[in-house]
Amino acid sequence: ASDFINSDGETVSGPEAIAKAAGVIAATPSSKSIVRTEIPGAAKLPERLKNSQYENAVRNGLLLLSVNSDGKVVFDSGVNTLINPDEEKQDNGWKKIKRAKVRHETFYRLDCEMDKLIGKVNGTKDGIANVIQRGQVVLDTMADEGKLIDPTFKLDTNKGYGADYGYFVVNAVDVDTLERIFIHYKWKYSENS
C-alpha cells in the first residue's frame, strides 16, 4: 500500500518507495502533517485496499497512500511503525509521524538551549529561575508556531536541585491535525416528517 506507479508507468516499491516517502516526510515541517501531501512523481496506485484491509494496515503501522479528488497520489495516513507503545514511557502520540517530529524537535531545541547554560548558571534559586525562564521561552516559541499547547517548563519538585544539578519537567500537548473527517447526514422526506 506504500507502492505506487510513477509517471513513466514503472512500479516504485520497496527501498525506493521508502526513500521517496522518507524524503517527503523529512521535507515536511513539524507544524504540518504529511496526510494529503502529494508524492512527487507518483501517477497512480497499483491496488486499492478494501476498508477492512485499510483499517488493519493502519493499526499495524503501514504508511498508506491513496488518490485524492484531484487524481493525485497522496499520503493517506500519518502513522509510523510503532504499534505498541511502552505504556510506562510512551503514549499513542508516538505512533504519529507529525507528533513524533514535534517531540524530537522539542528535545533538540531544549537541549541546545540548556547546553548554553551548563557550567554558566549557579546552582542557586536565581540560577534555577534562569533555567526555567530560558526553557519556557523555547516552549512558548513552539506554542506560537502552532506546535505545542500550554507547555510548561518547571522544576521537578520530587528531585529538586542542588549545588551542581537541577531536575526539570516539561508538560505539553503536541498539536495534531485532523486526518479523517466524518459527516453524518440526517435527511428528511419532508418538512413535516
Task: Please report, for each region that a protein language model flagged, where it lies by residue.
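A generic structural signal for short, non-catalytic loop/turn and secondary-structure boundary residues
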Residues: N68, G146-L148, A163
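A glycine- and small-residue-enriched flexible loop/hinge signal that marks low-structured segments
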Residues: A1-K116, V131, L155
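Extended, compositionally biased non-globular segments
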Residues: E105-D156
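Residue-level signal for functionally critical sites in structured catalytic/ligand-binding pockets
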Residues: A1, I97, H104, Y108, ...
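Compositionally biased, low-complexity/repeat regions
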Residues: T152-S193
